[in-house]
A protein has these predicted regions:
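A short, basic N-terminal segment
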Residues: 1-26, 305-306
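Walker A/P-loop nucleotide-binding motif
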Residues: 22-42
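A short hydrophobic beta-strand->loop->alpha-helix junction that borders the nucleotide-binding pocket
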Residues: 32, 55-65
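Post-Walker A helix-loop "phosphate-sensing" segment adjacent to the P-loop in P-loop NTPases
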Residues: 46-55, 80-83, 135
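Conserved NTP-binding/hydrolysis module of P-loop NTPases
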Residues: 62-85
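Conserved P-loop NTPase "ATPase switch" module shared by AAA+ and STAND
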Residues: 101-123, 127
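The catalytic "switch" region of P-loop NTPases
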Residues: 107-109, 126-200, 204-206
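C-terminal alpha-helical "lid" subdomain
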Residues: 188-192, 196-306
C-alpha cells in the first residue's frame, strides 16, 4: 500500500537523521508493529542515496548471541573494498584496522542494528567505546539501534548509566492519534479508484477499529480478518458486529501488552528476581496478592506499561 507518514513522523525522521550525522548512539524504540523496521529501512536507503555517509547494517539474526566482534565484522564487510576480507582476531589490531578503514573512507559511518533490545549490556557498552575510538582518530561513527520499548527502559537502568546518558532516544509512536486517517488511507490505497470507503466499511466499524487498535500491523491484520469474515457471510459493508467477531478479546491483557513492549517470561523473571512460574501466575491473575503487588510496583518503577 505504500508508506503512510504523519506530520509528527516526518519531523521525527528529520531529527533522527540529524542525530545520526552527529556521531553518537541513537535508539529508535516502539512496540511491535508500529513501523520501526520500516523506518530503519527508509533511513538506511535515504542516507545511502544521499551519499554523505557510509551506511552499514548488521545482518545477524541471533541478536541474543550478537557480540561486539559480530557488529565490528559487519562494519568490516561493508566498508572494506578488498576482495578477500580478513578480520583480525586480536582485539587491539582489529579496532586499529577498523579505525584506519573508516579514516580511509573519508566519510562519517552509520551502523544500523535492528532488534537491539536483545543485545547484552556489555555489547552496548562496547559500541559506545568503539564510537569513542573512532572519534579519537578524527572519524565519525554513529550506531543506530532499533528495538522494543524494553530497549529504552534498559538504557535508563542504573547499570546502563554509562550508555544511557550518551544515547539519543526516539520513541516511535507510529500512527497513534491518527488511526482513523490511517484506516481510510489504507482502504483507498488497496481498492480501485472509484471505491468509497463507506461502501465496504461502516463509519462505526472504522471508529471501533481506530479505538481498539494502535499499530499499522494490528489494523492490517484485523481488516483482513474482517473482510474475510464479511465475505463468508455475504455482508457488505463490514459492520461493527463483524469487527467485534474478529477482534482479539485478549489484545489488551497484561501478557500480550508486555510482549509488544519486548518482554517475555524469562526476561521478566531475570530482571525482577522472580521465578518464571510467578510471572506466569501474574499473567493469569492467580499470583498471591502481596507478591503480585510487589512485582507490579517494581515493573511500574522500571517503566513497564501495566
Amino acid at each position: 500500500a505504500g508508506y503512510y507518514e504523519t506530520d509528527y513522523q516526518k519531523q521525527m525522521f528529520k531529527d533522527i537523521k540529524f542525530a545520526i550525522h552527529s556521531g553518537k548512539l541513537v535508539a529508535i524504540t516502539g512496540i511491535i508493529g508500529c513501523g520501526k523496521t520500516t523506518t530503519l529501512r527508509r533511513l538506511f536507503d535515504v542516507l545511502e542515496k544521499e551519499g554523505k555517509m557510509i551506511v552499514s547494517k548488521s545482518l545477524c539474526v541471533e541478536k541474543k548471541r550478537t557480540t561486539l566482534p559480530t557488529l565490528i565484522a559487519a562494519l568490516f564487510y561493508d566498508l572494506s573494498t578488498d576482495k578477500e576480507i580478513k578480520i583480525p582476531k586480536d582485539g587491539e589490531k582489529r579496532e586499529r584496522e577498523l579505525r584506519n578503514l573508516i579514516k580511509k573512507g573519508k566519510k562519517p559511518v552509520a551502523l544500523f542494528v535492528d532488534e537491539a533490545h536483545d543485545l547484552h549490556y556489555s555489547t552496548l557498552t562496547g559500541l559506545k567505546r568503539l564510537i569513542e575510538v573512532v572519534e579519537d582518530s578524527g572519524g565519525i561513527l554513529s550506531v543506530v539501534l532499533a528495538g522494543h520499548p524494553k530497549l529504552k527502559n534498559d538504557l535508563r537502568r542504573p547499570m546502563m548509566e554509562e550508555i544511557g546518558y550518551r544515547t539519543t532516544v526516539f520513541s516511535l509512536e507510529g500512527i497513534v492519534g491518527n488511526q482513523r486517517e490511517y484506516i481510510e488511507w489504507l482502504v483507498s490505497e488497496c481498492t480501485i479508484d472509484d471505491t468509497v470507503s463507506s461502501d465496504i466499511l461502516d463509519a462505526e466499524a472504522i471508529e471501533l477499529l481506530a479505538t481498539r487498535l494502535r499499530t499499522p500491523l494490528q489494523i492490517e491484520q484485523h481488516l483482513t480478518l474482517a473482510f474475510e469474515a464479511a465475505y463468508r457471510v455475504a455482508v457488505k459493508p463490514v459492520t461493527t458486529v463483524i469487527i467485534e467477531s474478529v477482534l482479539s478479546k485478549q489484545i489488551d491483557d497484561l501478557e500480550p501488552t508486555l510482549t509488544r513492549h519486548g518482554y517475555d517470561v524469562s526476561g521478566l523473571a531475570e530482571q525482577f528476581n522472580a521465578k518464571p512460574a510467578e510471572i506466569k501466575l501474574l499473567f493469569r491473575g492467580q499470583l498471591d496478592p502481596p507478591r503480585a503487588r510487589e512485582l507490579q510496583e517494581q515493573m511500574l518503577a522500571a517503566g513497564l506499561p501495566l
